[in-house]
């Protein structure tokens, strides 16, 4: 692979990673420990490897029409997660709120990586080199998720409980933006 072929993949990796960054800003406003931030970022990175890989494999056999379905599903997941964060912040006390672990972490990581599935579909049809592409997507998304989570964590310290509500609203807004791009 030449450098000229690698540049568009790097740009795509950052574009997909910005989704993870934006959503992680909101998630970072939840009460998270550094260990959880590390684990969340790694999980997002792994999903950004798995999802485009599946997309690339399927993209070699399926038409592009499924990209819209993946886009819609990712938006709905983000909106649902955002409402959950707002709900848990307003209606539950501090002890009952849960950090994104277990199934909620996988739902979160799936939601922010679903766009990479549709990109993988397109790249699979195009015939891009699979290993380089998925590793690049995973690494960049993991790095940007960590940055977003850490910035969100510091913003939460400044905003308190309202920061968590703002984080949930950011997720809902981002999901709505995916559904209805301006």
UniProtKB/Swiss-Prot annotation:
GO terms for cellular component: plasma membrane. Coiled coil: none annotated. InterPro entries: Mntp/YtaF, Put_MntP. The keyword Nucleotidyltransferase does not apply. The chain crosses the membrane at residues 6-26, 37-57, 71-91, 101-121, 131-151, 162-182. Its main location: membrane. Keywords: Cell membrane, Ion transport, Manganese, Membrane, Transmembrane, Transmembrane helix, Transport. One of its GO terms (molecular function) is manganese ion transmembrane transporter activity. It is found in: Cell membrane. One of its GO terms (biological process) is manganese ion export across plasma membrane. It is a multi-pass membrane protein. Belongs to the MntP (TC 9.B.29) family. Probably functions as a manganese efflux pump. PANTHER family: MANGANESE EFFLUX PUMP MNTP-RELATED (PTHR35529:SF1). This is Putative manganese efflux pump MntP. It comes from Bacillus cereus (strain ATCC 14579 / DSM 31 / CCUG 7414 / JCM 2152 / NBRC 15305 / NCIMB 9373 / NCTC 2599 / NRRL B-3711). The gene is mntP.
């Amino acid at each position: 692979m030449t450098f000229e072929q690698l540049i568009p993949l790097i740009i795509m990796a950052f574009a997909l990673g910005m989704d993870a960054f934006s959503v992680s800003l909101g998630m970072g406003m939840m009460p998270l420990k550094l260990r959880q931030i590390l684990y969340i970022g790694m999980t997002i990175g792994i999903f950004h490897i798995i999802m485009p890989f599946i997309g690339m494999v399927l993209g070699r056999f399926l038409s592009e029409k499924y990209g819209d379905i993946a886009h819609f599903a990712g938006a709905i997941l983000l909106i649902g997660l955002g409402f959950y964060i707002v709900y848990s912040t307003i209606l539950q006390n501090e002890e009952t709120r849960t950090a994104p672990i277990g199934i909620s972490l996988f739902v979160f990581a799936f939601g922010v990586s679903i766009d990479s599935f549709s990109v993988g579909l397109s790249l699979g049809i195009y015939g891009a080199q699979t290993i380089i592409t998925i590793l690049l997507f995973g690494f960049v998304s993991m790095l940007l998720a960590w940055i977003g989570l850490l910035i969100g964590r510091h913003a939460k310290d400044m905003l308190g409980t309202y920061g968590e509500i703002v984080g949930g609203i950011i997720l809902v807004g981002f999901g709505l933006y995916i559904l209805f791009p301006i």
